[in-house]
């Protein structure tokens, strides 16, 4: 193989490795508004996030349930 061919292959592998590294570990966030009861309950929030999103984690914020999950 010639030198330019080796460099092109190396650069392609490098770019592909960087592209996959950027997409790993990205988190998305979604919010559920609480209508009843008036205050968010931690157990309900966690269960709803797991039901809606695989590996979702729920956190209560007054009248909202915040779900953080892998994109």
From Swiss-Prot:
Protein's GO biological process: defense response to fungus; killing of cells of another organism
Keyword field: Antimicrobial, Disulfide bond, Fungicide, Plant defense, Secreted, Signal
Cellular component, GO annotation: extracellular region
InterPro entries cross-referenced by the UniProt entry: DEFL
Organism: Arabidopsis thaliana (Mouse-ear cress)
Disulfide bonds: 28-71, 40-60, 45-65, 49-67
UniProt-recorded name of the protein: Defensin-like protein 124
Signal peptide feature range: 1-25
Family note: Belongs to the DEFL family.
Subcellular location: Secreted
A Pfam family this chain is assigned to: SLR1-BP
